[in-house]
Amino acid sequence: MAKKVVAQVRLQLEAGKATPAPPVGPALGQRGVNLMEFCKKFNAATADKAGMIIPVIITVYEDRSFTFITKTPPASFLLKKAAKLNSGSQEPKRKIVGKVTREQIKEIAEIKKEDLNANDIEAAMKIIEGTAKSMGIEVVD
């Protein structure tokens, strides 16, 4: 018989640097999950992606065991990295804060394709371009 799911927790954590401190501690501690066990498993699973922000979905079961699924880094994080920015524009449609090339958009779309609701790379690129525009990043050829 399958275990009963008690909760699903979504977090965005830096790869290889999860600690029992907030945000991990409060989110998982109140559900009775062994924090150190989660941190060790997450850090081991994401050690090769150091420096990136990794979204993770943690499924907590009735017996306090857990499983987790890591996703690809957020498009906004990858765009900021490609454009060498610390943050997006405060006024996205009016103020341009950086530029990315179509080639960089394609690379980001390749990375994100498995998590995006897109059938082909062109559709994934359009999604990433929309994210770039909403951040005040200009797409150039």
Curated annotation (Swiss-Prot):
Gene Ontology cellular-component annotations: cytosolic large ribosomal subunit
Keyword Nuclease found: no
InterPro entries: Ribosomal_uL11 (IPR000911), Ribosomal_uL11_bac-typ (IPR006519), Ribosomal_uL11_C (IPR020783), Ribosomal_uL11_C_sf (IPR036769), Ribosomal_uL11_CS (IPR020785), Ribosomal_uL11_N (IPR020784), Ribosomal_uL11_N_sf (IPR036796)
GO biological process, one term: translation
Top-level taxonomic group: Bacteria
Assembly information from the UniProt record: Part of the ribosomal stalk of the 50S ribosomal subunit. Interacts with L10 and the large rRNA to form the base of the stalk. L10 forms an elongated spine to which L12 dimers bind in a sequential fashion forming a multimeric L10(L12)X complex.
Stated family: Belongs to the universal ribosomal protein uL11 family.
Function, in words: Forms part of the ribosomal stalk which helps the ribosome interact with GTP-bound translation factors.
Protein name: Large ribosomal subunit protein uL11
